[in-house]
Amino acid sequence: MKELLYYTFIETEVTGAFLVFREKTQNLVFASLGNDKLFLLGKVEGFLKKHEKQDTMYDLQELKEAETYKKSIENYTICLENKMPLPSGAIPFEFLFGTDFQRKVWNELLNVEHGHVVTYGDIAKRIGKPTAARSVGRACGSNNLALLVPCHRIVGSNRKLTGYKWSCKLKEQLLNNEKENSLSLSRL
């Protein structure tokens, strides 16, 4: 069986983003950050090939008619520019891949609020695996829904920035933007 996925690329002052939507559900299934469109396309093609199931192949096509996905694309742009925290459900998404453990971690990351950080150990405790901080870190590194699953809000036990799939510099910028916007929103 073939399943159709559509991709598009957006650019912002912060960085670019490569977005992939599943036609069947119209949900976002992949969001990667960076400014090199061809590099990101190659990454997603490799990722899909690696994760093809025996009965499912993925056909990746450029999104030509964006109307169906327009609101999700606009909301992702707002999210990327950190203009404001988005309400839950503003961008419908789903985990197309991932182990049970990874999905458990990713679902817990959804509870980390805009403008806040927690440690890998905190997440491990929250999912009932208090000694699994490193495994939580690996699950964060496997996250393919940048920003929506906010792995950028997770820091080391010493509260310092640690690795980020899309660069520690970008992680720092995203956190600083969120912090500034949270302070601005609290003054309203």
UniProtKB/Swiss-Prot annotation:
Location of this chain's protein in the cell: Nucleus
Top-rank lineage group of the source organism: Eukaryota
CC annotations in GO: nucleus; peroxisome
Keywords recorded for this protein, A-Z: DNA damage, DNA repair, DNA-binding, Methyltransferase, Nucleus, Transferase
Gene3D superfamilies per UniProt: Winged helix-like DNA-binding domain superfamily/Winged helix DNA-binding domain
EC number: 2.1.1.63
Reaction it catalyzes: a 6-O-methyl-2'-deoxyguanosine in DNA + L-cysteinyl-[protein] = S-methyl-L-cysteinyl-[protein] + a 2'-deoxyguanosine in DNA; a 4-O-methyl-thymidine in DNA + L-cysteinyl-[protein] = a thymidine in DNA + S-methyl-L-cysteinyl-[protein]
Expression induction or repression: In contrast to some bacterial and mammalian enzymes, MGT1 is not induced by alkylating agents.
Residues bound to DNA: Y120, G121, R134, S157
GO biological process, one term: DNA alkylation repair
Disulfide bridge map: none
Keyword Methyltransferase: yes
Main location: nucleus
GO molecular function: DNA binding; methylated-DNA-[protein]-cysteine S-methyltransferase activity
Residues annotated as catalytic: C151 (nucleophile)
Role: Involved in the cellular defense against the biological effects of O6-methylguanine (O6-MeG) and O4-methylthymine (O4-MeT) in DNA. Repairs the methylated nucleobase in DNA by stoichiometrically transferring the methyl group to a cysteine residue in the enzyme. This is a suicide reaction: the enzyme is irreversibly inactivated. Prefers double-stranded DNA over single-stranded DNA as substrate.
Miscellaneous section: Present with 150 molecules/cell in log phase YPD medium, but not detectable in stationary phase cells. This enzyme catalyzes only one turnover and therefore is not strictly catalytic. According to one definition, an enzyme is a biocatalyst that acts repeatedly and over many reaction cycles.
UniProt similarity note: Belongs to the MGMT family.
Name of the protein this chain belongs to: Methylated-DNA--protein-cysteine methyltransferase
Species annotation: Saccharomyces cerevisiae (strain ATCC 204508 / S288c)
Origin organism lineage: Eukaryota, Fungi, Dikarya, Ascomycota, Saccharomycotina
